[in-house]
A protein has these predicted regions:
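S-adenosylmethionine
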Residues: 1-437
Length: 437
């Protein structure tokens, strides 16, 4: 068996699952269950498969440049396998061309692409010749089209980002969408403290550092084979939560004895953070309309040994009708709204290809309904925090501005927008803090 064949085959299988509509992280998990790879193999497979997903448009340009048949006419299975080979040749500098080609061709030979192994070999070898001669695909000189091609983003999305932040910042954000995302943990301060847990990780030869300005944030500096096999998982000493997301719950400043609503709670990283900040001594109602996601939340609550949270399967936009006793009941409300997730494209590489302007418009309508529906549940002296993991202003500050204009009795106390940056870790995030006048 050619060295590296299984890793390429697994990566190709991930692309096939993603093309069928499975989320990239779920596809990775499903495929890895069928193999026994070590941590280095898993890191390689993750980089290769997720890189192919991110750079789909860029890799298609190279297929069009080096093949007689354009990418749109390639059989899908062949197209994705060509992406596996091309990504290694174009984006993975440490892999020799010969190894990239031979291992990728071997996948074709040992699967139902056997009859096309010669085609794979020819296209990849032709690509090497083009690389060596610096004969690259012709890319438009138009800045937006060029950025779309080089950073492999839908052109409609690039136009939107440029409209939001300008071309210079858009280039930085586009690069950030293609970098390897950080893996951040939030320490469960109900059970341990940051320095103690860092020492525990160091004893296990796990490279991790504290995140500045976050009381309980830790960054893992290398990919573990399985996140659940890290020390302290079973004991509930930590949860996975991006550093930008860890800014949200503290804005609400949950206190002992307060009644708190998390209106879109599952899978629960912010719910458990609220409980943690209130020393597990608040009355927290976690609402979500997905029973499956609520089960994940309940599992997290049990693992972290959090007792102050009760869950409710419901649509938060209907809470006033189904639970009228909750009107003016809550001291604090968190709406971590369903959103386009544009701030997390590095972490969710397939999202860029499934998003559309129409989907965003539908989400905006839902976000507006959530704000209008949940506001009556807040006490007159209460605080509401609205958050998203997007950088789209129509879902963020523009939406909040319209909400304030419509509801004259409330005011904006503060808002924060975090943009993804190529040279800094962290997702894009937005949060607004609102209260009655």
């Amino acid at each position: 068996m050619i060295k590296g064949y299984l890793q390429r085959k697994a990566s190709w299988e991930i692309l096939l699952k993603v093309s069928s509509g499975i989320y990239s992280d779920h596809a990775l998990e499903k495929v890895l269950k069928n193999y026994e790879f070590n941590s280095l193999d898993i890191a390689f497979i993750t980089e290769l498969s997720f890189g192919c997903i991110r750079y789909r448009k860029f890799l298609d340009l190279w297929i069009d440049h080096t093949s007689k048949l354009p990418h749109v006419k390639q059989p899908p299975k062949l197209r994705w396998l060509l992406h596996i080979g091309l990504y290694q040749l174009l984006k993975m500098d440490k892999i020799p061309f010969s190894a990239a080609i031979s291992s990728t061709v071997e996948v074709a030979k040992k699967t139902d692409l056997k009859g096309l192994a010669g085609t794979v070999n020819a296209i990849l070898r032709n690509t090497v010749r083009h690389i060596e001669k610096e004969n690259v695909p012709k890319i438009s000189s138009d800045e937006i089209e060029r950025l779309s091609s080089l950073e492999s983003l839908p052109i409609w999305l690039v136009k939107e980002i440029v409209n939001w932040v300008g071309i210079k910042e858009a280039k930085n954000i586009a690069k950030a969408f293609n970098k390897k995302p950080s893996i951040d943990l939030r320490i469960n301060s109900l059970k341990t403290d940051l320095n103690k847990f860092l020492n525990e990780l160091a004893e296990c030869n796990i490279n991790a550092t504290a995140i500045s300005q976050l009381k309980n944030g830790i960054a893992l500096n290398s990919n573990p084979r399985s996140i659940k096999k890290l020390p302290g998982y079973r004991d509930g000493l930590w949860v996975v939560q991006d550093r930008s997301s860890q800014w949200v719950a503290p804005l609400l400043n949950p206190m002992k004895g307060e009644k708190i609503l998390d209106a879109c709670s599952a899978p629960g990283s912010k719910t458990t953070h609220l409980a943690q900040l209130a020393n597990d001594d608040a009355e927290i109602l976690a609402v979500d309309r997905s029973e499956k996601r609520l089960k994940i939340l309940q599992s997290n609550l049990e693992r972290l040994n959090i007792k102050s949270v009760k869950t409710l399967k419901a649509d938060a936009t209907n809470l006033v009708d189904i639970k009228p006793n909750l009107i003016s009941y809550f001291d604090k409300i968190l709406i971590d709204a369903p959103c386009s997730g544009i701030g997390t494209l590095a972490r969710n590489p397939d999202s860029r290809w499934s998003l559309s302007k129409d989907k965003i418009n539908q989400l905006i309508l839902l976000q507006e309904r959530l704000l209008e529906s949940v506001l009556p549940l807040l006490k007159r002296n209460g605080t509401l925090v609205y958050s998203t993991c997007t950088i789209c202003p129509e879902e963020n500050n523009f939406l909040i501005k319209r909400f304030l204009t419509k509801n004259k009795e409330i005011k904006l106390d503060s808002e924060k927008q975090i943009l993804p940056k190529f040279d800094e870790p962290g997702d894009g995030f937005y949060a607004a803090k609102i209260s009655y006048k």
